[in-house]
């Protein structure tokens, strides 16, 4: 079975229209979306009519959920991580699962977009 991939997808800081076309394409095509705050993320996903299974992934469950994410990717699923605003892993959850991807030789991709730095 072919492995899936993890995508770190930046989300707009403020205006929902600031999301990239590539980010929308990835969100429309992944199997699952891990979200820092599912309520906040649903605003974005509903705005763009993206209907994908969503689960919470935040600083309080990041360690355990990261293991589940890696397992699912190894089983062939493609998973996106999004935060409330900006790029996952920069002042937001994401760095733990990326470290585990490196340790486990699991493919991941960081999309360009808004960050807490900009």
Q: Where is each model-derived feature located?
A:
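Glycine-rich, flexible N-terminal cofactor/catalytic loop recognition
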Residues: 1-60
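Conserved strand-to-helix beginnings and helix N-cap segments that scaffold or border functional pockets
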Residues: 20-21, 66-67, 91-95
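Residues within well-ordered alpha-helices
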Residues: 23, 41, 68-69, 97
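Short beta->alpha linker loops
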Residues: 36-39, 60-61, 85, 112-115
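Glycine-rich loop at the start of a catalytic domain that most often binds anionic cofactors/ligands
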Residues: 46-51, 73, 94-95
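Generic short alpha-helical segment signal, independent of protein family or function
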Residues: 50, 62, 74-78
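Glycine-rich, highly charged phosphate/nucleotide-binding loops
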Residues: 61-70
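Short glycine-cluster motifs
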Residues: 74-118
């Amino acid at each position: 079975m072919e492995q899936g991939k993890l995508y770190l997808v930046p989300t707009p800081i403020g205006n929902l229209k600031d999301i990239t076309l590539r980010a929308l394409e990835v969100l429309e095509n992944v199997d699952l979306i891990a979200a820092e705050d599912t309520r906040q993320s649903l605003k974005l996903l509903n705005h763009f009519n993206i209907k994908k299974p969503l689960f919470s992934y935040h600083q309080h469950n990041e360690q355990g959920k990261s293991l589940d994410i890696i397992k699912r990717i190894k089983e062939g699923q493609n998973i996106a991580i999004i935060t409330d605003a900006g790029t996952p892993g920069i002042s937001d959850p994401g760095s733990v699962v990326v470290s585990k991807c490196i340790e486990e030789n699991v493919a991941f991709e960081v999309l360009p977009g808004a960050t807490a730095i900009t």
